[in-house]
């Protein structure tokens, strides 16, 4: 499929400097228009001192990529996007290392930088962005620790959740991670809220005590009934929807806690903000985004360790595997919430096991 915006084709050239140290070819996907991918062949990168080269074996779709980029929030003049974009949930095997901190043959989660996304067969990275994982278990399951690790950071901002009633609005990969972790940490009640039946079922499997189907019942009345009139101590917005912020303000009890994780694609706007509710509830509102902290990898590393010892398994959130060549299908599945998708992984270079 050709580039739909030929006037900006030259922008791609400026973005290729990352790949200039090379001797072989790799395949990478990129967005050339809203909701439209194609593949490009690029020179394979070679690490310099202090870097390692990783063969990517599993890439996963993130909701923020869908809401913030895939649906067309990017200005038209920025297309085509850089190779590999949008994707930041990736894992693979170190095939060449020029740093004492990383060993060839080690599997790892990788956080891409330098404008390069994860929809690529290979990339190079510095050790601070490469997070080793054990050599057992499927790499397509270990990659789930990336997004659940970001949730681990957010859950820590809640303080002690033991004995608390918690509602999580949205039960995609992020929302389900909140349901799983807060239950593990001793929450008295965890209510998963989502219109998709498959996601509500998964919520009950991994820790939620109750679920609410907002398309079928009055969400606020259902929560009132489920809590016996006690209300929600902590509410989480994991929707990626501009309506989510206001809905959470209505859900949380007076003087409760509202944890905002959601990133929307509507230029950051909040829809139907309930100002009266905001003033009356006087809730503590905590925006959480681990990527904006000084230690963006700390909680992901901790999540890897927690999975390794069996405390919690983010791998349970993976619902589908597709081939790398089916990148368009993978993003469409996530966007449409079709086939009961929760987290879809693309197997790259024969990965997925």
Predicted regions and their residues:
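C-terminal capping/lid region of NAD(P)-dependent oxidoreductase domains
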Residues: 16-25, 229, 259, 266-267, ...
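Glycine-rich beta-strand-centered segment in the early N-terminal region that forms part
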Residues: 45-60, 73-114
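Residue-level marker of beta-strand positions
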Residues: 51, 106-107, 122, 165, ...
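NAD(P)H dinucleotide-binding glycine-rich loop of Rossmann-like/cofactor-binding domains
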Residues: 88, 108-169
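Local beta-strand N-terminus motif with an aromatic residue
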Residues: 120, 231-232, 327
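Mid-domain Rossmann-like dinucleotide-binding core that forms the NAD(H)/NADP(H) cofactor-binding site
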Residues: 141-217, 221
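Glycine-rich cofactor phosphate-binding loops and adjacent beta1-alpha1 units
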Residues: 161, 206-283, 353
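C-terminal substrate-binding/catalytic core of Rossmann-like NAD(P)-dependent dehydrogenases/reductases
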Residues: 269-319, 328-329
């Amino acid at each position: 499929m050709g580039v739909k915006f030929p006037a900006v084709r030259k922008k791609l050239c400026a973005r290729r400097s990352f790949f200039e140290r090379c001797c072989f070819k790799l395949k990478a996907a990129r967005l050339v228009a809203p909701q439209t991918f194609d593949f490009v062949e690029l020179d394979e990168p070679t690490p310099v001192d202090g870097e390692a080269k990783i063969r990517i074996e599993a890439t996963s779709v993130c909701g923020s990529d869908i809401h913030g980029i895939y649906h067309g929030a990017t200005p038209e003049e920025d297309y085509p996007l850089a190779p590999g974009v949008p994707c930041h949930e990736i894992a693979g095997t170190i095939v060449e290392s020029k740093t004492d901190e990383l060993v060839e043959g080690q599997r790892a989660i990788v956080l891409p930088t330098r404008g390069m996304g994860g929809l690529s067969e290979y990339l190079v990275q510095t050790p601070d962005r490469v997070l080793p994982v054990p050599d057992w278990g499927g790499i397509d399951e270990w990659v789930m620790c990336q997004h659940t690790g970001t949730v681990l950071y957010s859950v820590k901002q809640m303080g002690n959740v033991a004995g608390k009633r918690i509602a999580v609005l949205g039960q995609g990969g992020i929302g389900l991670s909140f349901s799983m972790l807060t239950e593990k940490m001793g929450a008295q009640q965890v209510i998963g809220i989502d219109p998709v039946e498959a996601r509500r079922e998964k919520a009950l499997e991994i820790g939620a005590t109750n679920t609410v189907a907002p398309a079928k019942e009055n969400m606020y009345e259902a929560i009132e009934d489920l809590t016996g009139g006690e209300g929600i101590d902590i509410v989480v917005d994991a929707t990626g929807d501009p309506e989510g912020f206001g809905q959470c303000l209505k859900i949380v009890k007076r003087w409760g806690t509202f944890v905002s994780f959601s990133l929307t694609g509507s230029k950051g706007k909040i829809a139907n903000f309930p100002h009266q509710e905001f003033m009356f509830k006087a809730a503590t509102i905590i925006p959480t985004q681990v990527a904006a902290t000084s230690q963006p990898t700390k909680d992901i590393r901790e999540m890897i360790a927690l999975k390794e010892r069996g405390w919690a398994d983010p791998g349970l959130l993976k619902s589908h595997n597709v081939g790398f060549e089916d990148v368009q299908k993978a993003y469409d599945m996530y966007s449409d919430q079709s086939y009961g998708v929760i987290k879809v992984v693309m197997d790259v270079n024969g990965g997925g096991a």
